[in-house]
Amino acid sequence: KVEDDGSYEQVIDADGCVVAPGLIDVHVHFRDPGLTYKEDIQTGSAAAKKGGYTTVVTMANTKPPVDNVETVKYIIEEGEKTGINVLPAACVSVGMKGQELTDMDALKAAGAVGFTDDGIPLMNEKLVYEAMKKAKELNVPLSFHEEDPAFISENGINAGAVAKELGITGSPALAEDSLVARDCMIALHTGASVNIQHISSATSVKAVKLAKELGADVTAEVTPHHFTLDETAVLEHGAMAKMNPPLRTAKDRAGIIEGIKDGSIDMIATDHAPHSMEEKA
């Protein structure tokens, strides 16, 4: 019970509500600029406020990508109109092509709070290494989408029993596990602050746990759907249950829940990423 400690202007009846500090979502796609037929900064922020979120970090895969100072400033200016904190992450690579580092100094100075090519995995290990060294110098985090396309023939669904039942190959956990292991070790050797995005594999959770034990500055996030659903959801919901990385096995889901409990996973992030109905069909 909160004791009455003085005068007040308003009494809010919060019976049946959860009273908490404003929530923070480190992984949202507001599709602005360039893809605003799906969402924009104003509508995304309104939805965030409705859900109790007062700070969000927007991903960089807009059109154009957030690889330039002008787009960073645009997101900040639009965010200031919303009533919540809208913090832009900028691209690691120019055009999200994975070949050349962005001007991370200038992007940070413009207001970028971190760097990510979310949606596209970075396959150039040398570029990842250089990005981590620069991020360490600037004291900013990097966030990585970990799916090696070399192991994936059909994305959106786990390579497992459900995919086999549907007559497709799917995306194996190996695609995630291999890049998580790589980036955890590069993080260990560079001292960079690295976040593993939307983790979906129990083995990847163990890799993050090991990296932390070795002293790496690594964090991991998980989405609500990856710890509440598994690959069988595709049979019920069809394309609406397809995503990257995919929903995996019940064993993976259990491993993720255990990772939340033991601290291997640090954050629940929504990966709020609206699409049109035509795109999801």
Predicted segments, located by residue:
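Acidic (Asp/Glu)-rich catalytic clusters
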Residues: 75-81, 104-109
